[in-house]
C-alpha cells in the first residue's frame, strides 16, 4: 500500500472510486472535495485545486493548507482509500474536524486499510513537526473510532455538532 499524490493518470480510477460511494449511498470523507468537483467541474480542475491547497499563500480562509492522497494497493494499482491531511487547523477544525479526514471505498472495508492509511497520515504530520494529531468521527461510527483507537487515539472530547447535526468525538494521537 502507498500514498499517491493524484495525477491525471488516475482520472478514471478516481471517478470509479467516487462512483462506488454513490452506488453504496455511502458518505465520502477525505477526498479534498473530489466528489463535488466531479459533479460541478472537472477532475483536471480538482488537480489544480489540490496543488494550490498545499501552499498557505494560495488557500482562502477559513480553509487551511492540506495534502490529499489516494491510498493505492500496489498489486493492482487500485484506489482503496483517500486521505486529506491538514497542515494547520482553523478554529472549526480544532473543535470538530481535526487534522485528517479519510475514507475507504465500500468494497474494500474491514481489511485494515483505514488503520494503515491513518497511520501513514499521522506519520506525514509527524515529519513536519505536528506531534499531536487531532482526528474526529461521528460517535455512531464505531469502525472509525476503532481505527483511531488502533492508532493510539485518546478521546479528548465528545460534543454535539451543530454543523453535522450529530454527536462527534475528537481524539488526539500523540507521537
Regions found by a protein language model. Name each.
Residues 88-90, 107, 140:
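Short coil/turn motifs at secondary-structure junctions
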Residues 136-137, 152-169:
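Conserved catalytic-core motifs of GNAT/GCN5-like acyltransferases
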Amino acid at each position: 500500500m502507498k500514498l499517491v499524490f493524484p495525477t491525471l493518470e488516475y482520472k478514471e480510477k478516481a471517478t470509479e472510486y467516487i462512483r462506488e460511494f454513490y452506488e453504496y449511498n455511502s458518505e465520502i470523507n477525505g477526498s479534498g472535495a473530489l466528489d463535488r468537483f466531479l459533479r460541478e467541474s472537472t477532475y483536471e480542475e480538482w488537480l489544480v485545486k489540490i496543488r494550490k491547497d498545499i501552499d498557505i499563500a494560495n488557500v482562502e480562509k477559513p480553509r487551511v493548507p492540506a495534502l490529499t492522497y489516494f491510498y493505492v494497493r500496489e498489486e493492482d494499482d487500485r484506489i482503496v482509500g483517500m486521505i486529506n491531511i491538514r497542515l494547520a487547523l482553523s478554529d472549526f477544525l480544532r473543535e470538530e474536524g481535526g487534522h485528517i479526514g479519510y475514507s475507504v471505498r465500500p468494497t474494500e472495508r474491514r481489511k485494515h486499510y483505514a488503520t494503515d492509511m491513518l497511520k501513514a497520515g499521522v506519520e506525514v504530520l509527524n515529519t513536519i513537526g505536528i506531534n499531536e494529531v487531532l482526528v474526529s468521527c461521528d460517535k455512531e461510527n464505531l469502525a472509525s473510532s476503532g481505527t483511531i483507537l488502533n492508532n493510539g487515539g485518546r478521546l479528548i472530547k465528545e460534543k454535539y455538532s451543530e454543523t453535522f447535526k450529530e454527536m462527534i468525538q475528537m481524539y488526539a494521537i500523540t507521537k
